A protein has these predicted regions:
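Multi-bladed beta-propeller domains
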Residues: 11-43, 70-88, 109, 119-136, ...
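Residue-level signal for WD-repeat beta-propeller blades
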Residues: 49-50, 61, 71, 96, ...
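Conserved beta-propeller blade repeats
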Residues: 39-58, 84-106, 116, 133-152, ...
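Bacterial Sec-dependent signal peptides at the C-terminal "C-region" and cleavage site
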Residues: 2-12
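Generic alpha-helical hydrophobic packing signal
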Residues: 67, 148-150, 165-167
Length: 173
């Protein structure tokens, strides 16, 4: 009788890496499936308003953030950029701008040399605004009519950040 009392109950032990689990029930497949709807969500970051009143956002799909716009309450997202690399620093043109679109930054292959680009709404084309070389560019601001763009860049020597001013009509910096 004493042997029965002293006998240790059999424990189910699972070791995965550094984690040791003992006597835990298996998680039902239905529970895992129902949790997916809460765990697989996408966030959206507010970037501003377009000149025609649409909401400009950055939304991450898979492993990369891209620019989207939403033009009505409860409306569908319309994806505007389609790159392998994430876009960031999205800045819409001001309400009084001479052309509709937005500035965004993007690097190549994770090289961290962010370049600035212009996305033109009417033509859906993208234009490189900075040197396209081994420089980091960002911190963009536009004046009231979008004719001048100020930004910081390491283009001069690759290290120090300078403030650059670009005429968006002529392309001169």
């Amino acid at each position: 009788l004493l042997a029965l009392v002293c006998t240790e109950a059999r424990q189910e032990r699972i070791e995965i890496g550094n984690r040791i689990s003992e006597n835990l029930p298996e998680i039902p497949a239905e529970l895992i499936e129902s949790l997916n709807q809460y765990q697989n969500t996408r966030g959206a970051g507010f970037a501003g308003w377009t000149t025609d009143g649409c909401l400009l956002i950055s939304t991450r799909f898979a492993e990369t953030a891209q620019a989207h716009r939403v033009c009505q309450p409860m409306g569908m997202r319309e994806q505007l950029t389609f790159y392998k690399e994430p876009v960031g620093g999205i800045l819409p043109s001001p309400a009084n701008a001479w052309r509709p679109g937005f500035v965004f930054s993007k690097d190549k292959g994770g090289d961290e040399f962010s370049q600035l680009y212009w996305f033109d709404y009417p033509s859906r084309t993208t234009t490189l605004l900075t040197d396209g070389k081994r420089s980091q560019n960002g911190g963009t601001v536009l004046n009231e009519d979008g004719s001048l763009m100020a930004y910081s860049s390491t283009a001069r020597n690759g290290t120090d950040r300078d403030i650059w001013l670009r005429d968006t009509k002529t392309g001169q910096s």
